[in-house]
Amino acid sequence: MAQADRPARGGLAARPMRGASFALAGLVACAACAAVVLWLRPAAPSPAPAGAVAGGPAAGVPAAASGAAEAAMPLPAALPGALAGSHAPRLPLAAGGRLARTRAVREFFDYCLTAQGELTPAALDALVRREIAAQLDGSPAQAEALGVWRRYRAYFDALAQLPGDGAVLGDKLDPAAMQLALDQRAALADRTLGEWAEPFFGDEQRRQRHDLERIRIANDTTLSPEQKAARLAALDAQLTPDERAQQAALHAQQDAVTKIADLQKAGATPDQMRAQIAQTLGPEAAARAAQMQQDDEAWQTRYQAYAAERDRIAAQGLAPQDRDARIAQLRQQTFTAPGEAIRAASLDRGAGG
């Protein structure tokens, strides 16, 4: 999973054409995320501090006390907005109804973590308990899944104590810094997740070490281009067939993203960019781009209406505290979906509002 999106910035000059470019650029950015060395950041969004419930045995809270706290917590009535219309991945079972130690368990938890921006830590724990119970109620795997969730939360709580939440700081691909970040996160996963560290992060860590070695080879000034190519080929030969296929798909996506970015820099129209997206990333991606464009144009229209009312309030000569409170109330009433009010506030700051 990924980190929380940064709010968009800009001024009141935002118009539908800018919205079209914003939407298309957003799709390009989403594709580009896959082309980055993903392990420069922690692998999933970091939950808020979990408190007694999330700490669990892995964080030093007795299991009995943790279970009592969980039982007392009310369950959320409905899925939060980020998960509306979706279903949690299936939790895998092994023989005897026990929880299978596979990455699918992490994918289940990462699905729930998608909603963390809308929920308090207690509500997030309640959501996870409800989703676990929906699949495993009364089985031995239910208690196991709750225990693994507590460990996973403890992992993120500890990760938040590292500089930059365990991310590589700075803009350069510094192999030493990357190695340190990888080692720190691996040690932390072993300490908090125990036997679950391998199914949760094992494949990812091996890919990360492979990526790191590629960077080291590319940065080695003592090697000729031919020597670098030979070493990279030898390194890639160590990959499994599935890993090689994934790498080839990633390279193809990188090429597509580069072409689309070049079009954007050259001032291509939204229609031209959508055509390129359809050609390089497929018709489904082009359809998503069109929908993103429509959604963003609708948002820009709402923002412009809001900005006019905001400016009217600002012109009334109110005391700064009263003016800001009125504008904040207007913003919250106008932008109700998660993240919208933050984006509007950022645009206000860019416009000097």
UniProtKB/Swiss-Prot annotation:
SUPFAM superfamilies: Lipase chaperone-like (SSF158855). The keyword Chloroplast does not apply. The keyword NADP does not apply. InterPro entries: Lipase_chaperone. One of its GO terms (cellular component) is plasma membrane. Residues 1-19 are cytoplasmic. Pfam families: Lipase_chap. The chain crosses the membrane at residues 20-40. GO terms for molecular function: unfolded protein binding. Residues 41-353 are periplasmic. It is found in: Cell inner membrane. Induction: By growth on olive oil or oleic acid; part of the lip-lifO (also called lipA-lipB) operon. Disruption phenotype: Significant loss of extracellular active lipase (lip). Not required for growth on oleic acid as a carbon source. Cells can translate lipase; while its signal peptide is processed, it is not secreted. Keywords: Cell inner membrane, Cell membrane, Chaperone, Lipid degradation, Lipid metabolism, Membrane, Transmembrane, Transmembrane helix. It is a single-pass membrane protein. Involved in the folding of the extracellular lipase (lip) during its passage through the periplasm. Belongs to the lipase chaperone family. NCBIfam families: PRK01294.1-1. Monomer. Interacts with lipase (lip). This is Lipase-specific foldase. It comes from Burkholderia plantarii.
